[in-house]
Structures are given as structure tokens and as C-alpha cells.
């Protein structure tokens, strides 16, 4: 059984007539699996995970057939029941560590707060465990950093502190939302290596939200590609990179600079992602898709399974007779 199973998730901001920012999403993650969610800004990647964590506030609202994590339907859990899971069995590392950390408290206090709440540690054991966590995320001179405030740390150090807080209770699922945003290339590589080492050591599932397809190709076992709030393709690595089945996935891969060597321009799709007031009747990619036919413009395709994953397209690429 999957550790995480999301069925027909929708997220709206406003009333029931509002256009969903996430629409009909199905997604699963197995224990110990590394799943990447990719797509351009505004595709619904972060909102999907915030809905799972219970972080969508009014006027936003969440609906789903179920949001099942480790046997619990997160939609039906009350506040206290949810708090026993979120932050303990399921944790999240946010995009910007400088805003994710509270500037009014030392990093040691913030790590200790997680340990007090979820593990019940007190006194010397609490302090020692906080120190061990800083050492585990490879912060130099960890003992002296316990009493430091977030503004006294670099971006890379702050991200390591955020990771230490997230893994403090040894979660079964860690969600990393653009964990290398605003970090230089060297630090990005170190943070990704750290996350993957922790994932292997603790045998936890990892959901990686990213724009970086190179990172995905090197680290993920499966990929969910999102466009305009929908999952358009789900597949394994490297098959999804070698033989993408959705035109949008193909376009993302073609836009990688290394694939455009010698060209005057990067490969791009014409047009822009549809907004609230210009969503097409049919497939959301149809106004931009080079393969679109009249059927695509009139009806919206469902996400259909095939032997290598799933695709939301009437005329999938590289499949021949594989569609179930």
C-alpha cells in the first residue's frame, strides 16, 4: 500500500465557482520513494503540498475523494489529530529559509520546539538532540550555532537549519519545496546531496518540488509533470526523459539549454499558461500544442494509465499501442 495516496484533489481560492488552481489531481508515493514534481511557476506544485499539510487558509478551500497518508485521511482529521502527524510523520522544507525561520528565536530554540512537541524531550536530552541534528545536517561549529539567530546565518546554513527542523522527528515523508532557491550553485549541490543522504539513511519518502530537470534526472525515481493545475504526465526516470508521452513534457525537455546547442534561440512553446479568464474549453495545452487537433480543443482529456505511467493526452507521444 502507498504511503501517500491523493485522489481527485482540487484547490480553489474563492467560492465554488472559482477556477481551481489544482484540479482533479491523483498522486501516490511509496515508502522510501523519491518523487519529483516539476512544472513552471503557477502550475500548482507548491499549493498541492500545502493542501496536504493543511496550510490552505480562507478564502482557499480543499476538496478531494481522499488525502490518505499512512492510513489516515488527512481531510477528515481534526486539529489535534492532524498535529500529531504534520511535523512528525510528514514534514516540509519551504522555499525560502530566511522567511521560514522565526527571526525572534535562536535556531536551537526552534529545533528544540519540534523535539518538545513531537518527541516529548526535555532538559539535557533536548539540548543534546538539537546539537546532534545540527551536526547531522553538516553545520560547522554546531554547538556555537545553537544560540545563533537566523539573521546571523547564510542562506545555505539557514536551509540546513530548516532541514534539521524537518527531520527532527524522523518523518516518513519529507516534502522539499524548491530547497535550493536563491542559493549559489555549489551550495545547491551540497543541499541536494544532504537531502538524498538523509532520505537513504532514514528510509523516508521524499517529494522534491523543483524546476531543475537535471536534478530530477539524477535523483528522482518517478516524476509528476504539472501544467495549469493538472498532472499531465507521471512516469519513471529515465523513461520519462527518454520517451516523454505528453507534448508539454517534451517541450520542457527540449528547452534544456544543452539540447539547444548551436541554436540561436532556446526551444519554446508559443503563448502563455492560461489564466482564470482565458482557459480553453478542451485540453489546457491545446492553444500552444503543436500536435493539437480539433478533438483536443473541444474536450478535456483524462489522466490515462499506460505501462510506463500515466498521461493526460488524446494523442500521446512515444506510446504506440501501450495505452491501457
UniProtKB/Swiss-Prot annotation:
Its membrane topology, per UniProt?
Peripheral membrane protein
Residue ranges crossing the lipid bilayer per the database entry: none
Q: Where in the cell is it found?
A: Cell inner membrane
UniProt: ATP binding residues: 39-46
**What CDD domains would the database entry show?**
ABC_NikE_OppD_transporters
Question: GO biological process: any one?
Answer: peptide transport
The entry's cellular-component GO terms read:
plasma membrane
Outcome of gene disruption: Deletion of the dppBCDF operon leads to reduced ability to utilize di/tripeptides as nitrogen source.
**A family per Pfam:** oligo_HPY
Q: Tell me which EC number(s) this protein carries.
A: 7.4.2.9
Instruction: Recite the UniProt keywords alphabetically.
Output: ATP-binding, Cell inner membrane, Cell membrane, Membrane, Nucleotide-binding, Peptide transport, Protein transport, Translocase, Transport
Q: What class of enzyme is it?
A: translocase
Q: Which GO terms describe its molecular function?
A: ATP binding; ATP hydrolysis activity
Q: Which domain of life is it from?
A: Bacteria
Domain called ABC transporter: residue spans: 4-253
Q: Which reaction does it catalyse?
A: a dipeptide(out) + ATP + H2O = a dipeptide(in) + ADP + phosphate + H(+)
State the similarity comment: Belongs to the ABC transporter superfamily.
Oligomer and partners: The complex is composed of two ATP-binding proteins (DppD and DppF), two transmembrane proteins (DppB and DppC) and a solute-binding protein (DppA1-A5). Five orthologous SBPs (DppA1-A5) are present in P.aeruginosa, which increases the substrate specificity of the DppBCDF transporter.
- What function does the entry list? Part of the ABC transporter DppABCDF involved in the uptake of various di/tripeptides. Is also involved in the uptake of phaseolotoxin, a toxic tripeptide inhibiting the enzyme ornithine carbamoyltransferase. Responsible for energy coupling to the transport system.
What is the protein name given in its UniProt record?
Di/tripeptide transport ATP-binding protein DppD
- Please tell me the species this chain comes from: Pseudomonas aeruginosa (strain UCBPP-PA14)
Amino acid at each position: 500500500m502507498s504511503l501517500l495516496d491523493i485522489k481527485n484533489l482540487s484547490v480553489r481560492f474563492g467560492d465554488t465557482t472559482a477556477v481551481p488552481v489544482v484540479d482533479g489531481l491523483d498522486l501516490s508515493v511509496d515508502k522510501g520513494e523519491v518523487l519529483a514534481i516539476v512544472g513552471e511557476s503557477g502550475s500548482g506544485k507548491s499549493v498541492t503540498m500545502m493542501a496536504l499539510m493543511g496550510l490552505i487558509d480562507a478564502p482557499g478551500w480543499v476538496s478531494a475523494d481522499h488525502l490518505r497518508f499512512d492510513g489516515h485521511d488527512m481531510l477528515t482529521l481534526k486539529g489535534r489529530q492532524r498535529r500529531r502527524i504534520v511535523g512528525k510523520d510528514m514534514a516540509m522544507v519551504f522555499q525560502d529559509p530566511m522567511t521560514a525561520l522565526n527571526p525572534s528565536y535562536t535556531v536551537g530554540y526552534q529545533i528544540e520546539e519540534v523535539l518538545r512537541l513531537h518527541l516529548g524531550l526535555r532538559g539535557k536530552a533536548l539540548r543534546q538532540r538539537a546539537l546532534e541534528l545540527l551536526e547531522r545536517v553538516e553545520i560547522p561549529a554546531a554547538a556555537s550555532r545553537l544560540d545563533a539567530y537566523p539573521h546571523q546565518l547564510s542562506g545555505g546554513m539557514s536551509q540546513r537549519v530548516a532541514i534539521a527542523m524537518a527531520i527532527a522527528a524522523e518523518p516518513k515523508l519529507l516534502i522539499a519545496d524548491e530547497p535550493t532557491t536563491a542559493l549559489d550553485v555549489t551550495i545547491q549541490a551540497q543541499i541536494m546531496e544532504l537531502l538524498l543522504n538523509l532520505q537513504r539513511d532514514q528510509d523516508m519518502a521524499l517529494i522534491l518540488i523543483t524546476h531543475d530537470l537535471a536534478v530530477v534526472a539524477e535523483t528522482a525515481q518517478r516524476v509528476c509533470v504539472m501544467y495549469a493545475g493538472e498532472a499531465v504526465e507521471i512516469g519513471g526516470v529515465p523513461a520519462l526523459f527518454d520517451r516523454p508521452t505528453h507534448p508539454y513534457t517534451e517541450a520542457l525537455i527540449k528547452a534544456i539549454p544543452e539540447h539547444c546547442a548551436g541554436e540561436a534561440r532556446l526551444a519554446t512553446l508559443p503563448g502563455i499558461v492560461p489564466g482564470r479568464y482565458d482557459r480553453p474549453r478542451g485540453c489546457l495545452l491545446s492553444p500552444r500544442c503543436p500536435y493539437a487537433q480539433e478533438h483536443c480543443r473541444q474536450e478535456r482529456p483524462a489522466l490515462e494509465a499506460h505501462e510506463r505511467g500515466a498521461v493526460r493526452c488524446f494523442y500521446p507521444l512515444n506510446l504506440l499501442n501501450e495505452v491501457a
